[in-house]
Curated annotation (Swiss-Prot):
Stated name of the protein: UPF0228 protein MA_3119
Natural source organism: Methanosarcina acetivorans (strain ATCC 35395 / DSM 2834 / JCM 12185 / C2A)
Region (Disordered): 35-67
Assigned protein family: Belongs to the UPF0228 family.
Ranges of compositional bias, category Low complexity: 35-66
């Protein structure tokens, strides 16, 4: 009986020891709580953009405040004498410093066409006749060229008998201008450019010394203000 009692005590002691061991194991293996998340609900504020609305100024313009817009000459209308050919026009202009590249429109037809050349000996009589017949001429001043005056004639009277009789009386010929439009270019391309009025006047004075050129008109980029219109 004593032996049996000892066995039971050993069994109970073993069970108690095993229970303690189990409890110790449970406590020592309790998992670390990693379920608490890192608070990432407050995002980094990336919604504030970098201010790129103010561009870098790479287009610093050349100040044109001293340039009068009405002095920018974009082209010229050149009035050549009757019979001047296109090749003669080109050859003539090549002899002058045109300042800028240009494009030629030969024989432009939107200008007065007809004229007479009156020598100084007959100019008084012819002018007297033309003043009586005011519809015979265009309201354009006569151009003095050497020993002659160039008078622009209205197309309405070129078949008028009295006008033809006057031509015969003073041995005059009715002739046609050859007009050429010049457009200055920025380069060799089609863009219209301009030259200064100062250069245009210099060029006009030089060209009008040519025996084949009567007069030159300017075509302004911004036409001068005319209070009468």
């Amino acid at each position: 009986m004593v032996e049996m009692s000892n066995v039971r005590k050993e069994i109970v002691a073993f069970i108690v020891l095993l229970s303690l061991l189990l409890l110790w194991t449970l406590f020592t293996q309790a998992p670390i709580n990693t379920s608490t998340p890192v608070n990432t609900s407050t995002p980094v504020n990336t919604s504030t953009p970098v201010n790129t609305s103010t561009p870098v100024n790479t287009s610093t313009p050349v100040s044109t405040s001293t340039i009068d817009p009405e002095s920018q000459v974009a082209g010229m209308a050149i009035q050549f004498k009757n019979g001047t050919s296109e090749s003669e026009v080109k050859s003539t202009l090549q002899n002058y410093n045109m300042t800028q590249n240009y494009r030629i429109t030969f024989d432009a037809n939107h200008y007065p066409e007809y004229y007479i050349m009156v020598n100084k000996e007959n100019i008084t009589d012819v002018k007297g006749k033309l003043e009586k017949e005011k519809t015979w001429t265009e309201p354009i001043p006569a151009i003095e060229k050497g020993n002659y005056y160039i008078i622009t004639i209205s197309e309405r009277v070129i078949h008028n008998k009295n006008f033809i009789m006057m031509l015969s009386k003073y041995n005059l010929q009715l002739e046609k201008f050859v007009w050429c439009d010049i457009r200055f270019l920025y380069s060799d391309g089609p863009l219209t450019y301009w030259i200064s009025k100062e250069d245009a006047i210099r060029l006009k004075n030089e060209l009008e010394q040519n025996e084949n050129i009567f007069t030159i008109r300017f075509d302004y980029l911004y036409p001068p203000y005319d209070p009468t219109t």
